[in-house]
């Protein structure tokens, strides 16, 4: 994470410059167009002084970060949300939003995204929780607190506990593969009767009215 040139210039690894630059990087990531989970993992990679992409700690952090926040808000992991809410008998298959919403066609890729099933209130709560977590990390950097991978991974539950959110006790009862299979099975049934309203259809309909 640290630039080799900085070390050659003789600057202290954890000096003021390190934390100032780290804070700038974190804020740049926050302002980017990356998805929220990508932002968290990007910040993890930037902040951890012993970062190793192949570490079991890193793999576990990347695999569980989304679930920790989903569980904090809904009491379910991402896979559990998808598995229990994907239903071909419901309007829009149970989705509250999708790539082409509100009037566009629902695609198979839409039905395996947990956030697409959340109510507007839950989405606001989720985004607010993640934003507050980013603020918490910035405060730690401003106080010149460095993170190891273990410390950064632990900071998530530390933050959630302090703010009285639910804490995910395990890896959940439904796997990502099970959730995806169930959602796609429901989609295949739903898609048979999904209305198609193309520009051509609209033009013909307008001519007939």
Model-derived features: positions:
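Positively charged, phosphate-engaging catalytic surfaces used for nucleic-acid and nucleotide handling
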Residues: 1-209
